[in-house]
């Protein structure tokens, strides 16, 4: 129907973090829609998962999504997804406002590609998967150099 439904994600929103996770694990509407429907999240892993203790970061915590409403009990009204009537409206609002100070937005398009929006540089990358993967590889090289 042309609408865009979004939710806020707190941790690791940069391309080598959330961007890389999205292109690897959340790359179809069937996978991503139920995850977005649960609303704003502290962290996304490889699966939606079940309700967990928000403040206990033990085994499995980083493998699954951690939601503010489901897992921390915040009011749903404060953590619900937002639906925009079109991509154009979303882009305009996001680029102007960044409602929660987000650094990046990622949009799974109907053709299966991702668009990456970076408001601080006014950069919009359509078909962004290659650049997201390149950024993840660059970050891994930096980590490897630091560890050496």
Task: Label each residue range with its predicted role.
Residues 1-14, 18:
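Short, extreme N-terminal segment that most often corresponds to the first beta-strand
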Residues 24-148:
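Low-complexity intrinsically disordered segments
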């Amino acid at each position: 129907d042309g609408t865009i439904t979004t939710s806020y994600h707190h941790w690791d929103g940069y391309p080598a973090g959330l961007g890389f996770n999205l292109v690897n694990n959340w790359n179809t509407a069937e996978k991503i829609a139920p995850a977005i429907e649960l609303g704003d999240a502290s962290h996304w892993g490889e699966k939606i998962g079940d309700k967990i203790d928000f403040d206990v970061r033990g085994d499995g915590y980083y493998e699954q999504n951690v939601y503010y409403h489901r897992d921390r009990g915040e009011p749903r009204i404060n953590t619900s997804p937002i639906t925009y009537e079109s991509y154009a409206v979303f882009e305009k609002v996001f680029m102007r406002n960044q409602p929660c100070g987000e650094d990046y937005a990622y949009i799974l398009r109907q053709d299966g590609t991702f668009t990456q929006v970076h408001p601080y540089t006014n950069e919009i990358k359509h078909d962004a998967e290659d650049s997201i993967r390149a950024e993840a590889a660059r970050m891994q090289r930096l980590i490897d150099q630091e560890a050496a």
